[in-house]
Amino acid sequence: MTSSAWGLLALFLAALLVLAWPVGKFLAALCNERVPRWMQRVEAPLYKIAGTRPEQSMHWLRYAIALLAFNAVGAVFVYALQRLQGWLPLNPAGMGAVSPDSAFNTAVSFVSNTNWQGYAGESAMSYLTQMLGLAVQNFFSAATGIAVAFALIRGFARRGDGKARGLVGNFWADLTRITLWVLVPLSFVLAVFFVSQGVIQNFDAYKTVQTVEATAAGGQTLAMGPVASQEAIKMLGTNGGGFFNANSAHPYENPSALANLLQMIAVFLIPAALCFAFGRVAGDLRQGWAVLAAMTVMFVAAVMVVIPAEQDGNPLFGALGVDQLHGALQSGGNMEGKEVRFGIDASALFAAVTTAASCGAVIAMHDSFTPLGGMVPMVLMQLGEVVFGGVGSGLYGMLIFAMLAVFIAGLMIGRTPEYLGKKIEVREMKLISIAILVTPVLVLAGTAVAVLAGAGKAGIANPGAHGFSEILYALSSAANNNGSAFAGLSANTPFYNGLLGLAMWLGRFAVIVPVLAIAGSLAAKQRLPVTGGTLPTHGPLFVSLLIGTVLLVGLLNYVPALALGPVVEHLVLWK
């Protein structure tokens, strides 16, 4: 890695820690349901309209049913909005109805916090669909993930006695408070900053401008729209779906180096803050630091692979005498598919950030990365999106691995495993197994179906190892709710829209339900005191055990598939 790459990484991590600490403190207060009176007065009319009482905590099953029902209604609404947009207002470009299969895929994508996009926003979606459908789900899907994390944290924190025994909180109160007091204020501040940098925010009709050189088309059409407001929650909510087809590579979405840095910080802000919130609510800040340390170590390791892989360039160019060395006058390395204004360091770091989190935003085409460089984003997703991960989903995913780690440690020393004073028993381990195995089954089975089916093979534009990698990446992205793509795959077809839509829905909610069941089970248990035989879960030894568990359990499932795709491609390229 170059000195500029190290400097960018250090600046990014330092700024992230400084900003995440106070946000984590506020999230802990919300998780503990310590809401000031003035906030309660603002919330009260919403609860009255909804017919719910925020102080009434729910059993995990009731919490899960409310969550699933809310998200199902959201999916139906977004689907209907796309199908009807041709007859609705705020459609200056005259966009017609989205096809049924694409509308289904997009509705599931945004409700599940995946934001996989098989369409180009500027040529498919009206302003109303973008604002009322997609942007609203950016808020609600993010709030849903944080709410599940809150429920699991409460499961650890509650004593297992009294009226709160077995209860995990009120979904409607969590959803309202997270949206009103976390996501909306942060998004407003970030959107104003983006506007100051040059991100557009308007309802103008598309503009036709004359280019410097005359063209047969007579000019260029510039798409407009309310971009800044959607861009903010796109990053803060680890959503990733771009207003434009080029996503954050588009100058109207990401116009400057400073905006680019803030976008990366925004992606990790809430996942990092939730680690601090977890430590505070659990009554031991060291627990939060341990989880954050494990995430950070794996993230830095990924960055240390992807940046040099891109900086080394393409050996086929080297054989032609092309200068690919980094220097004062050029970025060097593999610049295919990258914005010159960002270069290799920022592009590779952005790719690591958005695939470590379940964001999916891009400033470079991952399909144009070197085989090794492209494998890093794929592996970060296949780990289960627990390296920071999505808002909420990253923390509850990592806590699932933490419970598995203490279970393995308990087997090695012959003690009943416990984490934060709660015994990890047969019921929890069955649910943990389900939560961990859902996504590998979806990814590998979906990939097998796609490479066997004629409709799946028809979408491959690059036969061979890279074509297989494109399919594996698409299923990894969908099932792990990331949303980025190796865009060489033609995925906006009925086959892929259906397959990926199913993977996105199950990858989201077939994990959330067992996590909530674990939360309810833990909340019903007494919290045991710490003894001399208790495994410390806050030191370097446990951090190492946790990282090892994530890598062994999360990654080994995919080694044969990776060997058929990026590994083969890398060996062929560098033979």
UniProtKB/Swiss-Prot annotation:
Record field: transmembrane: 4-24, 61-81, 133-153, 180-200, 258-278, 289-309, 344-364, 372-392, 394-414, 431-451, 499-519, 545-565
GO molecular function: P-type potassium transmembrane transporter activity; potassium ion binding
Cellular location(s): Cell inner membrane
Pfam families, per database record: KdpA
Record-linked InterPro entries: KdpA
GO cellular component: plasma membrane
Main location: membrane
Disulfide bond annotation, renumbered to this chain: none
Topology of the protein relative to the lipid bilayer: Multi-pass membrane protein
Keywords for the protein's UniProt record, in alphabetical order: Cell inner membrane, Cell membrane, Ion transport, Membrane, Potassium, Potassium transport, Transmembrane, Transmembrane helix, Transport
NCBIfam families named among the record's database cross-references: kdpA
Task of the protein: Part of the high-affinity ATP-driven potassium transport (or Kdp) system, which catalyzes the hydrolysis of ATP coupled with the electrogenic transport of potassium into the cytoplasm. This subunit binds the periplasmic potassium ions and delivers the ions to the membrane domain of KdpB through an intramembrane tunnel.
Oligomer status and interactors: The system is composed of three essential subunits: KdpA, KdpB and KdpC.
Family: Belongs to the KdpA family.
Cited PANTHER family: POTASSIUM-TRANSPORTING ATPASE A CHAIN, POTASSIUM-TRANSPORTING ATPASE POTASSIUM-BINDING SUBUNIT
Name of the protein: Potassium-transporting ATPase potassium-binding subunit
Provenance organism: Variovorax paradoxus (strain S110)
